[in-house]
From Swiss-Prot:
This is tRNA N6-adenosine threonylcarbamoyltransferase. InterPro entries: ATPase_NBD, Gcp-like_dom, KAE1/TsaD, Peptidase_M22_CS, TsaD. Fe cation binds at H111, H115, D304. It comes from Helicobacter pylori (strain J99 / ATCC 700824) (Campylobacter pylori J99). It comes from the Bacteria.
Amino acid sequence: MILSIESSCDDSSLALTRIEDAKLIAHFKISQEKHHSSYGGVVPEIASRLHAENLPLLLERVKISLNKDFSKIKAIAITNQPGLSVTLIEGLMMAKALSLSLNLPLILEDHLRGHVYSLFINEKQTRMPLSVLLVSGGHSLILEARDYEDIKIVATSLDDSFGESFDKVSKMLDLGYPGGPIVEKLALDYAHPNEPLMFPIPLKNSPNLAFSFSGLKNAVRLEVEKNAHNLNDEVKQKIGYHFQSAAIEHLIQQTKRYFKIKRPKIFGIVGGASQNLALRKAFEDLCAEFDCELVLAPLEFCSDNAAMIGRSSLEAYQKKRFIPLEKADISPRTLLKNFE
């Protein structure tokens, strides 16, 4: 088995993945959402301290699941990039300690690659080549994945990420963090879902394949300010619905532009923001239009987790891509290449 560790942001997670058939044997996770909610976003120093507290607790649960028999573990895998430096280092320190004390090889894994492999948790075979939309609090990307060592970034956001824009809109409406499920609930509760959109679709006439949410976010801010003295539930629902609809339509329009160029046969959607049901439905319709198979990450493995890191690290294990402890380090940025 591979013991994998994830601590790139505000989720502490450990998992055990069986090498022979890629079966997820155990998955443990502690979310920090309630600790960051009052701040409207993740506070790195708080996240780091909580990882230092939570990771040892999760390791104890791993010990119990193994009956304290670590002989079944053949490698340690850790997310080392991209992410918050102060949280990545907490996971790396645990991984190094386990690697040294158990005399096991160490695998460094890219967090974005891990999200791609969340599509294949519990599956021995992957479905590559495929194209992937990654939407989360930190990223809005289209990726092309040909194999483990050949994953390229085709499109990215020029400013805010998809998930980050939901967080900021929720904060404008004084509704808390994380904003994704809050804004989604507003949209679901809105009583007039078929009216024309009140916010502009970003980059609608731009020839560039990219994402942008800052203009849409600013349009929401102006609407909130206009209704400052009458920001009741119905107004909040209306803003939430129209913002979400415009944000998803932007993703659809840009991805459709990509589809017309590349005509992918398989398209995956991953990342924490991919739990949004309206987004999933919109992409079901888009993929049906282009006769493209849609593959969705399971809802429980959309947000950051060690199970996806365990699944991706199986590929590294087979290729013996091990890193000496003295060379193991972290990076706040991904090393995945931009498409050339």
